[in-house]
Swiss-Prot record:
Protein name: Protein unc-45 homolog B
Described function: Acts as a co-chaperone for HSP90 and is required for proper folding of the myosin motor domain. Plays a role in sarcomere formation during muscle cell development. Is necessary for normal early lens development.
Matching InterPro entries: ARM-like, ARM-type_fold, Armadillo, TPR-like_helical_dom_sf, TPR_rpt, UCS_central_dom
SUPFAM superfamilies reported in the protein's UniProt record: ARM repeat (SSF48371), TPR-like (SSF48452)
Repeat (ARM) residue spans along the chain: 169-208, 211-250, 751-790
The protein's assembly and partners: Interacts with HSP90 in an ATP-independent manner. Interacts with UBE4B; the interaction may target UNC45B for proteasomal degradation.
Keyword match Cytoplasm: yes
Recorded name of the encoding gene: Unc45b
Length: 931
């Protein structure tokens, strides 16, 4: 019974294979393998699954399956040749050569085997030449580097060559086999910064994607030494060591995603102990006074990237639990650091923000309430332990910690604000005489007032205090933070015109002061950052945003701040937020008139729209932003380091880009300033909402711009996937429509682009929209298909039996919409020109084909008529019998009438095509010239 089912599954797999559905074929063969013990059938199944692997480019799997078939039958020539092909793609040329040599012995006259033998022989000779030269080059490089008397430029060149070699698989293996790790350790011992850097970068390349090498290097160099190098003040060195550790972590945790061929039961090293040791050392670095600010930042970056789960569907969050139990107090210590206090650890401007992000990611990674309660208790105990009436520094640290948590997991921060004494301590510190205390307290109040209920509490209890500090303090840093606090409280009602917190005109005064500080380059960046943050809140008020976009110096000062290398997460986020407010690209809930009436009747507050939030005002603001150079600022922000550019900021940038692209007339300016290129990374990475918004922006640009200019070089291929994602039926109609327009434009450029669109599986979606009831969607999809049919693989789908693709195109030619007819007739003309079989198939798919063709040839739109005549010419050229059928119909009369017309400038192509059709009929002898 099982054997019969296995044979049936094999046949099913063969059918899937013939239909080019290789995934389904693989599934059928795999199911059959579980059911049979018949050796001959097993060999066939493994051999067939290997063929699927080759087609899907899963070469390691293909080689493994072919090997199993050969284990059963060593003379299985198909399996041998398939393994040879797989091994060649995996770069194992010597093993591939042995397999094809065996094939050639079994079938000496097979030209294919002989040709493969010759090709592999040439490749192996070349590989050997490179390998021997690599061996000698490695030796020479180390000799130059370790020789004290070598010239400086020679040493620099040798170091750079070594780094390049370490990044190549063959080069890395040669270095490793030539006792390279020991020699690299010698280089590190020389204490010369440039040699140390070269050694670290070479090791980083050698660890990438190779677990065994990474493990050996980790044990040889030792984790404590790696961390001590990362702790150095040198930024370049710290970053290089961070990259080395990341490469080791990736390889140990299997994140390199490379296929490793071999037995499935092969021994796998247990790397958990090493990974835990790395995490433990990174946590220790956070609280060590010997570690530089740069080193602390890199340790936080590594923890941020590698501890929380990347996919929440994976249940194992043991790494997060380990860090919470063993390192949360250390992270809280970093968050609670106050730079102005003497006991502060070495920090950079980003350190506390990175620690807040880590706390946020750890909290989000917890799976249940008991885990979250445990996390909260650790935070509560830590903060409570810091409260000390005798030691003001400890109190300041406690409030700074709460402030940091409020910038991370906000819900947790809110719970901590509710602890006894926290809000009271904030207010008490505001009244302190020490400026450091005031600074921390004001910042904490700003972060605490995010929730409307808390903001209302602070408006009731703390505004007077903030105003007093603002008036009395001479310290600009405190003054600007107090101003931001007032800005935040003033914008607590959001964009709701009816919920203004302060008197009319107060927010404009605050904004004016923020703009003044923003333009003052004498103030340090960190302080000017607060001015941007103030504007991010105040620009929810339409009067403020209208004034701001008219203040060109303030706009450009903000853009320069965003472009600067010293910018941090907060600056980028605040700038992005301000631009979202100015362009009104935030989500607005749809107002249901009935609900508004109901709310008024029940005396509930109804949000009011500000008069300056109407579309005309928004369009004017967009124009002013473009004129001020917003695109170049956005392009610089997109290029920021991934540690600084968070997914939330990317989403905001995508919203701004989409709003800027709204008017087709502005898209040329956006492309000219590099907006097209800048949108691509936003469409590929970030939040789901952000990726969709960025993809929509790309679609708007791709629909009307020359792709060669908008997305120069290879970038154009990266645009395809985001556009295809917009074809999902879950997206709204406008996104579907503009994605189709963009794909139409791209598919008209080159066959390579058409191939890319086909490989991204866009064709089923395009076909789906050709059935759509919506006229514009159907037209856009048909136009896209008109370009796509130039691709051979698309033509093969029309040639395949058992589908109605050709029938749909023929029927669309008979629709009343001339634009739709034009696109469908264009596709049909291309298809019938490419394959004679399709000419015959066209006459079989529907009985109305001749009537539709005659309508096309008589169409009053010349472009449609021309395409109809081209189809007629293709049918006449395809087959004599088919030509006879056409001549016997009314089509001959139509061709004669059109052919006799005077070929003026507009009609020349139409008349010429009709005459070519008549000449074809004369060639067959169906008609004769009048003379």
């Amino acid at each position: 019974m099982a054997e019969a089912e296995a044979a049936q599954l094999k046949e099913e797999g063969n059918r899937h294979f013939q239909l080019q559905d290789y995934k389904a074929a693989t599934k059928s063969y795999s199911q059959a393998l579980k059911l049979t013990k018949d050796k001959a059938l097993l060999a066939t199944l493994y051999r067939n699954r290997a063929a699927c692997g080759l087609k899907m480019e899963s070469y390691a799997q293909a080689a493994s399956d072919a090997s199993r078939a050969i284990d059963i039958n060593s003379a299985d020539i198909k399996a041998l040749y398939r393994r040879c092909q797989a091994l060649e793609h995996l770069g194992k040329l010597d093993q591939a050569f042995k397999d094809v040599q065996r094939c050639a012995t079994l079938e000496p006259r097979n030209q294919n085997f002989q040709e493969t033998l010759r090709r592999l022989n040439t490749s192996i000779q070349e590989q050997l030449r490179v390998q021997f030269s690599t061996d000698s080059r490695v030796q020479t490089m180390f000799e130059i580097l370790l020789n004290e008397n070598s010239e400086a430029d020679k040493r620099e060149k040798a170091a750079n060559n070594l780094i390049v070699l370490g990044r190549e698989e063959a080069g890395a293996e040669r270095i490793f086999q030539s006792n390279g790790v020991a020699l690299l350790l010698q280089l590190m011992n020389t204490q010369r910064p440039e040699l140390l850097l070269a050694a670290v970068r070479t090791l980083s390349g050698m660890c990438s994607g190779h677990r065994a090498r990474a493990t050996a290097i980790l044990h040889a160099v030792r984790i404590d030494r790696i961390c001590s190098l990362m702790a150095l003040e040198n930024e370049e060195m710290s970053l290089a060591v961070c990259n080395l550790l990341q490469a080791i972590i990736d390889s140990l945790s299997g994140e390199d995603k490379r296929e490793h061929r071999g037995k499935e039961e092969a021994l796998v090293l247990d790397t958990k102990k090493d990974l835990k040791q790395i995490t433990s050392h990174l946590l220790d670095m956070l609280v060590s006074k010997k570690v530089s600010g740069q080193g602390r930042d890199q340790a936080l970056n590594l923890l941020n990237k590698n501890v929380p789960r990347k996919d929440l569907s994976i249940h194992d969050n043991s790494r997060t639990i380990y860090v919470v139990d063993n390192g949360l107090r250390k992270i809280l210590k970093v968050v609670g650091q106050v730079p102005d206090l003497p006991s502060c650890l070495p920090l950079t401007d980003n350190t506390r923000m990175l620690a807040s992000i880590l706390i946020n990611k750890l909290y989000d990674d917890l799976r249940c309430d008991p885990e979250r309660d445990h996390f909260r208790k650790i935070c509560e105990e830590y903060i409570t332990s810091k409260f000390d009436p005798q030691d003001m520094d400890k109190n300041v640290n406690a409030i700074q910690t709460v402030s940091g948590i409020l910038q991370g997991p906000f819900d947790l921060g809110n719970q901590l604000l509710g602890m006894k004494g926290v809000m009271e301590m904030m207010v008490a510190l505001c009244g302190s005489e020490r400026e450091a205390d005031q600074l921390v307290a004001v910042e904490a109040l700003i972060h605490a007032s995010t929730k409307l209920s808390r903001a209302t509490f602070i408006i009731t209890n703390g505004v007077t205090l903030l105003k007093q500090i603002y008036k009395t303090t001479k310290n600009e840093k405190i003054k600007i933070r107090t101003l931001v606090g007032l800005c935040k409280l003033g914008s607590a009602g959001g964009s709701d015109y009816g919920l203004r917190q302060f008197a009319e005109g107060s927010t404009e005064k605050l904004a004016k002061q923020c703009r003044k500080w923003l333009c003052n380059t004498a103030i340090d960046t960190r302080t000017r950052r607060w001015a941007v943050e103030g504007l991010a809140y105040l620009t929810l008020d339409a009067d403020v945003k209208d004034d701001f976009v008219q203040d060109i110096p303030a706009l450009q000062a903000m853009f320069e701040l965003a472009k600067a290398r010293t910018s941090d997460k907060t600056i980028l986020y605040s700038v992005a937020n301000t631009l979202v407010n100015c362009t009104n690209s935030y989500d607005v809930k749809e107002v249901v008139p009935e609900l508004v009436q109901l709310a008024k009747f029940s005396k509930q507050h109804v949000p009011e729209e500000h008069p300056k939030d109407k579309k005309d005002f928004v369009d004017l603001r967009v124009k002013r932003l473009l004129k001020a150079g917003v695109i170049s600022a956005l392009a610089c922000m997109v290029k920021a380091d991934s540690a600084i550019l968070t997914d939330q900021t990317k989403e905001l940038l995508a919203r701004v880009f989409l709003a800027l692209c709204d008017n087709p007339k502005d898209r040329g300016t956006i492309v000219a300033q590099g907006g097209g290129k800048a949108l691509i990374p936003l469409a590929l990475e970030g939040t789901d909402v952000g990726k969709v918004k960025a993809a929509h922006g790309l679609a708007k640009i791709a629909a009307v711009s020359n792709p060669d200019i908008a997305f120069p070089g290879e970038r154009v291929y990266e645009v395809v996937r985001p556009l295809v994602s917009l074809l999902d039926t879950q997206r709204d109609g406008l996104q579907n429509y503009e994605a189709l327009l963009g794909l139409t434009n791209l598919s008209g450029r080159s066959d390579k682009l058409r191939q890319k669109i086909f490989k991204e599986k866009a064709l089923p979606d395009i076909e789906n929209y050709m059935f759509e009831n919506h006229d514009q969607l159907r037209q856009a999809a048909t136009e896209c298909m008109c370009n796509m049919v130039l691709n051979k693989e698309v033509q093969e789908r029309f040639l395949a039996d058992g589908n109605d693709r050709l029938k749909l195109v023929v029927l669309l030619c008979g629709e009343d919409d001339h634009k739709l007819q034009n696109a469908a007739a264009g596709a049909l003309a291309m298809l019938t020109a490419a394959h004679k079989k399709l000419c015959l198939k066209m006459t079989e798919v529907t009985t109305q084909w001749l009537e539709i063709l005659q309508r096309l040839c008589l169409h009053d739109q010349l472009s449609v008529q021309h395409r109809g005549l081209v189809i007629a010419h293709n049918l006449l050229s395809a087959d004599a019998e088919l030509a006879r059928k056409l001549v016997e119909s009314e089509l001959l009369e139509i061709l004669t009438v059109v052919g006799k017309q005077e070929p003026d400038e507009k009609r020349a192509a139409v008349v010429q095509t009709a005459r070519e059709c008549l000449i074809k009929c004369m060639d067959y002898g169906f008609i004769k010239p009048v003379s």
